[in-house]
Amino acid sequence: MSLLYIILLFTQFLLLPTDAFDRSANTNIAVYWGQNSAGTQESLATYCESSDADIFLLSFLNQFPTLGLNFANACSDTFSDGLLHCTQIAEDIETCQSLGKKVLLSLGGASGSYLFSDDSQAETFAQTLWDTFGEGTGASERPFDSAVVDGFDFDIENNNEVGYSALATKLRTLFAEGTKQYYLSAAPQCPYPDASVGDLLENADIDFAFIQFYNNYCSVSGQFNWDTWLTYAQTVSPNKNIKLFLGLPGSASAAGSGYISDTSLLESTIADIASSSSFGGIALWDASQAFSNELNGEPYVEILKNLLTSASQTATTTVATSKTSAASTSSASTSSASTSQKKTTQSTTSTQSKSKVTLSPTASSAIKTSITQTTKTLTSSTKTKSSLGTTTTESTLNSVAITSMKTTLSSQITSAALVTPQTTTTSIVSSAPIQTAITSTLSPATKSSSVVSLQTATTSTLSPTTTSTSSGSTSSGSTSSDSTARTLAKELNAQYAAGKLNGKSTCTEGEIACSADGKFAVCDHSAWVYMECASGTTCYAYDSGDSVYTQCNFSYLESNYF
């Protein structure tokens, strides 16, 4: 065998793709690339050389079913019919893939011309995508030449759900004909369910959900509804292994709201959500923003990658410590030279005082809750469960001495408030965590539990202020048999139907309401922003138990609350 032949073989080996991507990891970062939102966009290959990003989303295929692409300043050459022909992007795709990155083509975007008339048209379009960007052979024009993307992302923002579930299902059948692993992802807005891809997420096999916690009332800084999406992943998604990504702006200029420069808040948030097997990492808009934005001289994307890695290592260490502790406990008869681990969860004998605060949607309300008790030190752990729209927390406080606490909920609460004052004292002795159910939707000023329930031997007294609605909301169809919550829901719906939103001439950041025509309304920078509800749903207030909610809900149930 000649030396030249050996060198050629070695060179080819070096050029083989290094499949470093781990779909099951919780440290992945996905970035959208192509729209040059910061004005400093570099080539796709340049960003792929960084170890801080793992998934690249080419944005966008913004016209379909008749194809139209837009990559800002990254591509301008076209075929004779006007479709972009991007030879440099094609080369970069293959470079990225050789570095172990996954490259998906994103469909949609905030602006564009795209929709399907029915499922049949969407299924036909699946073949077009496969032939034009995948391993199919039926297309005469391939914008990326021989380069083959690793899948498709649905960043649909036109509030039209028709066809996408059928498209995704058909793509799955075509992927089965391919020679590599393909992925499908979606980028829903954080309000659940999303008006554009809600049906897709509920009925199709999606690998990643890049949830946009920005430009919405729900964000990390307030009304963070991650638990709602976690419940979706675990109970609704056809793919129980779907990975949820925390979608964030790459800088302050990347979005109107939702950017987080507070690294301590980022760290605590990631630590809170990274322990779930459904957590996949962080998604960023966009590469030009996230790589050029620096905090204390460090690129934002690098900061986030380090936080993800740290959280993952902490979780791994915790599991290892727990296993060691268990082994030590079960080996009590071993020699005295053995080192025992101290259990991190200890039994606590305590008495409990329960007080329930039920928070519900309102246009204007201020709730002041005063909690007073004696000093008490507790040791335990916290575990959170959730269902759509409801958060149930089983918790005790971790070794803290509390003498008094005062919680003030202002008009940042997204929904009206129904507060039932009650003073109850119940004494129990237990070595297990005490379960306290909390139902709330609010926008706290700091990242803390919205409603505080403390285990203490004294009585907790809650003193709410008066909740009022505008005079226009009193003309409801409530009857004497209605519960207090049902009456409030009807009053709010009468207010919404009259076009009065929150009943005031101004709104407070984060307030929510419904428009007269059933749109979901959110106050953003002192102005109402309207969003269409998903197909089959409309916006109204409704009650559940002692709580009242304002959000998109099934249309056929609306008449029960008027």
Swiss-Prot record:
Residues 329-358, 461-484 are annotated as: Disordered. Changing T321S: In strain: DBY939. Its main location: secreted. Keywords: Carbohydrate metabolism, Cell wall, Cell wall biogenesis/degradation, Chitin degradation, Chitin-binding, Glycoprotein, Glycosidase, Hydrolase, Polysaccharide degradation, Secreted, Signal. It is found in: Secreted; Secreted, Cell wall. Glycans are attached at N553. The active site is at E157 (proton donor). GO terms for molecular function: chitin binding; chitinase activity; endochitinase activity. Residues 1-20 form the signal peptide. The keyword Transmembrane does not apply. Gene3D superfamilies: Glycosidases. It is an enzyme of class 3 (hydrolase). One of its GO terms (biological process) is polysaccharide catabolic process. Its EC number is 3.2.1.14. It catalyses: Random endo-hydrolysis of N-acetyl-beta-D-glucosaminide (1->4)-beta-linkages in chitin and chitodextrins. Residues 27-311 form the GH18 domain. One of its GO terms (cellular component) is fungal-type cell wall. Extensively glycosylated with a series of short O-linked mannose oligosaccharides ranging in size from Man(2) to Man(5). SUPFAM superfamilies: (Trans)glycosidases. Belongs to the glycosyl hydrolase 18 family. Chitinase class V subfamily. Chitinase is required for cell separation during growth of S.cerevisiae. Present with 6350 molecules/cell in log phase SD medium. This is Endochitinase. It comes from Saccharomyces cerevisiae (strain ATCC 204508 / S288c) (Baker's yeast). The gene is CTS1.
